[in-house]
A protein has these predicted regions:
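Conserved two-lobed SF2 helicase motor
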Residues: 140-156, 311-325, 331-351
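Conserved segment of the helicase C-terminal RecA-like domain
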Residues: 356-359, 363-366, 371-416
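Conserved P-loop/Walker A NTP-binding site and adjacent catalytic elements of P-loop NTPases
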Residues: 48-234, 238, 256-281, 316
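Conserved interdomain hinge at the start of the Helicase C-terminal
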Residues: 236-262, 269-272, 326-335
Length: 864
């Protein structure tokens, strides 16, 4: 494991005079200080709030912290911006002062990470840790930030013996999430000695939750739901086109504006439309240009984003690279972006200050159908409007449907002329369109968030976590079900599911029991549970077993290992859809050329999907594995080829994005490549790797790090309790000479792939694609057309087999590495006659190549 060095934001905290100031007010155990009483905790905390934070607490914040100090649970159902985070700080401080371990949980890793840094800043890095499945930082700290599932699994594994003194559960409305709600309910049922702070702006009626929590813990639950909204909201429904709505809001000074869309494509479409309307002043554009001066926009979407940012418009959605999302958030926090076009991810705790929220629709696609927004979804988004400390009110605008806007435009054009009014043909909603109107908007404004519907499930991993705790696991699982907030019918189904799981575990000899003297049973496991089971890579044990099926002597061994790893990773759906679309387009062209009729083409087209290497072998192996290892039934394999496809086609990140036209989803691709790198580096034993696989792993690391280093750093820096002085000792001394090439093996593969990709395109006779790759170093489309004509005048074809790709035909000269930060490379083309008289030669710019993730040349030529 790597030491967690204080880099970036964490390192800069040491220069902050307030760094760790709240943590310093807690008792110093090393000097023999004792716990302090609640009055002293209250006094120290609120003195710190006023002196260091410089704010005067609101009554509801004081009330909540007093309730927590009294030992009660608190449900904090207060509006966005009402200071829930301050209450959580008070809970963590009280726990630190009384020797209890406290947890902060959130639904997504980005929020957990953000809170981790916030808490480190006020409590000091020695007091705060983070666990997110693939990241463990200072995991023994007294304050832990983690995802909800981490805490739920710990609660099942340790029960009331868990070292969890108190928990702040943020975004608690996820309790009603059909897929993940179980993780918010389980701790409430299994940690009877733990104090809970449940927080959200959109909880609705929580009486049933409060009653259940009080019953399970025999502790009072205080509901605080009457806090006034710090910045009141005003609402408008408009029949103006979106561009005019934004223009009017800009003219009235109602910025910053967040334009909410329910698809990533729609967000970009609006941003492009607004870019020419002048939503920013000359001074704002100059400030933005200065702020982004050092930012490298190296990817296809990055160049689009750069152009939009310079006009004052930001983009924000989950398909972007993390570094681009962070940049937009930082610019917004500095007040530099008048307009941000994004998706409804705005509602999930993203720290972006907004004055006005413009909803482009009051409907969304929920994965199965279009439907109207629910009250909770609406308030989650609308509640982001209004900046505390800046605005006296926030503004929420809803756009009418497009057909209603067109009708209003026609009516306005007709004016009061009866003849013109009579001629107007009112447009209707398209067939099947789920529409809305001003009444829909008014109802959403007035509606309270729906009462949360609880969700529970029983899985093999949940049962095994209970078994690992020891004692009567079956009794505890039955009690978990009986104590849950589910309906009698749901409980009956959960008990039946538990019966199936326990029987399977017995039948496969995974668990056994021993009778106790009191008539009860002790459950225990006969096999070892994988480390971090069900938290990170639950199918890693299967992967290790399946690797035995491969022949290390096979020419495709390294690629087959990659396919096995890819089958255990979460699908990058946008990438796979693009692969399938391209495969079907190519198949359609071939079928038309073969003269197949329309119906037959359509039938065959449905059978074509994205590549799934080793699918039959993997599925057969997995079926057998699930019989022997029944907890694997909680998961499934998903064969696919993304990393393998990139290797086989010698693609770099930028080229792969262009090939499948997925610039808007480059963040999705990068996250997948990062997951693949971590799985390969962590899971595949060294004895199962050959030289080619090691090369590919190194290449993946270079690609991911060069595009967005945070995704590699997040994992590689995970691990540890090194203090600041130890971490600093690991950093290079001032003035120490840094290596020109950080990862020689990975960079070599990147360059070789880039050179051989050009050979592949020569074989396909693709001057357009070659010109797009090489126009910046003097070989555009026309130059490549002439080059290919000359080559094919001399040779019949280009070989692209293993011999053509071998190291014998790739020459690397590193002699100018230190003096000029350059490599001289030569890719000899394996022609049909074996003359080897043609070659692609270039001088690689090492610095730019390593920072951009694609090969950049100082000079370049293709000749014989």
């Amino acid at each position: 494991m790597h030491a967690f060095a204080p880099t970036g934001r964490l390192a800069s905290m040491a220069d902050d005079t307030n760094y760790g100031s709240l943590g310093a007010l807690a008792p110093n155990w090393d000097e023999g200080e004792r716990n302090i009483d609640t009055d002293e905790i209250y006094e120290r905390f609120f003195t710190w709030v006023e002196d260091v934070k410089g704010v005067e607490p609101w009554p509801h914040q004081e009330e909540a912290i007093m309730d927590l100090l009294a030992g009660d649970h608190v449900i904090l159902n207060t509006p966005t911006g009402s200071g829930k985070s301050l209450v959580a700080l008070g809970m963590h401080f009280a726990a630190l002062c009384t020797g209890r371990r406290s947890y902060y949980t959130a639904p997504i890793k980005a929020l957990v990470s953000e809170k981790f840094f916030d808490l480190v800043e006020v409590f000091g890095r020695e007091n705060v840790g983070m666990i997110t499945g693939d990241t463990h930082i200072n995991a023994d700290a007294p304050i832990i930030c983690c995802t909800a599932e981490i805490l739920a699994n710990q609660a099942l594994r340790d029960g009331r013996h868990a070292d969890v003194g108190c928990v702040a559960m943020d975004e608690f409305h996820y309790y009603g999430d059909p897929e993940r709600g179980w993780a918010w309910q389980v701790p409430l049922l299994t940690l009877p000695d733990t104090q809970f702070l449940l927080m959200s702006a959109t909880l609705g009626n929580v009486d049933a939750i409060a009653d259940k929590l009080e019953d399970m813990t025999d502790t009072d639950v205080d509901i605080i739901a009457d806090a006034p909204r710090p910045v009141p909201l005003t609402y408008e429904y408009t029949l103006d086109p979106l561009e005019k709505t934004v223009e009017l809001a800009f003219g009235k000074g109602e910025t910053p504006i967040y334009v909410v869309h329910f698809s990533q494509d729609a967000a970009l479409e609006t941003a492009n439309a607004l870019a020419s309307t002048g939503v920013s002043s000359k001074e704002q554009r100059a400030a933005i240009a200065e702020a982004i001066k050092g930012t490298k926009f190296t990817t296809a979407f990055g160049k689009i984003l750069q152009r939009l940012l310079r006009t004052g418009i930001g983009i924000h959605h989950a398909g972007m690279l993390p570094r681009y999302r962070r940049l937009v958030e930082q610019l917004a926090q500095q007040g530099l972006l008048p307009v941000i076009c994004g998706t409804d991810t705005l509602g999930v705790g993203i720290n972006v200050p907004i004055h006005s929220v413009v909803l482009t629709a009051l409907t969304k696609f929920d994965g199965t159908k279009m439907r109207k927004l629910r009250a909770r979804e609406f308030h989650q988004i609308a509640g982001r409007a209004g900046r505390m400390g800046f605005d006296t009110e926030g503004l929420v605008i809803a756009e009418a449907p497009e057909f209603e806007i067109e009708n209003a435009k026609a009516l306005a054009k007709a004016g009061n002329d009866p003849k013109k009014l009579k001629k107007i043909k009112r447009k209707k909603a398209p067939e099947g369109f789920v529409t809305w109107n001003e009444n829909t908007f008014d109802k959403l404004i007035d509606a309270a968030p729906e009462t949360l519907v609880p969700h529970m499930k029983i899985t093999h991993s949940m049962v095994l976590n209970e078994v690992e705790q020891g004692g009567d696991a079956r009794y505890r699982i039955d009690r978990l079900i009986d104590d849950s907030a589910q309906t009698p019918e749901q409980k009956e189904r959960l008990h039946a599911r538990a019966d199936e799981i326990f029987q399977t575990l017995f039948d496969t000899n995974v668990i056994e029991t021993e009778d106790r003297d009191d008539g009860g049973k002790d459950y225990f496991m006969t096999v070892d549970m994988p480390d971090d089971f069900a938290l990170d890579q639950p199918l890693s044990p299967f992967l290790l077993a399946a690797l035995e099926l491969l022949d290390p002597e096979s020419d495709t061994y390294a690629l087959d290992v990659i396919s096995m790893v890819e089958a255990t990773l979460e699908d990058p759906k946008q990438v796979l859809r693009a692969q399938e679309r391209q495969a079907r387009d190519e198949a359609m062209i071939r079928m038309k050329e073969d003269g197949l009729d329309y119906d037959e083409r359509m039938d065959r087209l449905q059978e074509i999907t994205y590549p799934k290497p080793l699918e039959d072998m993997l599925q057969a192996a997995f079926d057998e594995y699930r019989h022997d290892v029944p907890w694997a039934n909680d998961y499934w394999l998903s064969p696919k080829s993304v990393v393998r496809d990139m290797v086989e086609t010698a693609s770099d990140f930028t080229g792969y994005i262009a090939r499948y036209n997925i610039a808007r989803s480059e963040g999705t691709l990068l996250r997948y490549l990062s997951d693949a790198y971590r799985a390969l580096a962590r899971t595949v034993p060294q004895e199962k790797r050959d030289e080619q696989l090691d090369d590919i792993i190194s290449w993946l690391r270079v690609v991911v790090r060069s595009i967005d280093s945070s995704l590699v750093d997040e994992w590689e820096h995970a691990g540890t309790d090194t203090d600041a002085s130890e971490a600093a000792a690991n950093l290079a001394a001032p003035g120490a000479k840094q290596a020109v090439v950080e990862d020689r093996r990975g960079l070599t593969v990147l360059v070789r792939n880039a050179m051989f990709r050009r050979v592949q395109l020569m074989d396909l006779d693709k001057p357009d694609e070659l010109g797009a790759l090489d126009k910046d170093w003097g070989y555009g489309v026309h130059e490549w057309e002439d080059t290919l004509d000359d080559y094919y005048d001399e040779h019949e074809y280009v070989n692209i087999d293993a011999k053509a790709r071998s190291g014998e035909l790739f020459i690397l000269d590193e002699s100018k590495e230190n003096s000029e930060h350059a490599w001289k490379v030569r890719q000899i083309i394996d022609d049909s006659d074996g003359d080897h008289d043609w070659a692609i030669t270039g001088t690689v710019d090492l610095d730019t190549t390593q920072s951009s993730g694609e090969v950049v040349f100082f000079d370049y030529s293709v000749s014989n």
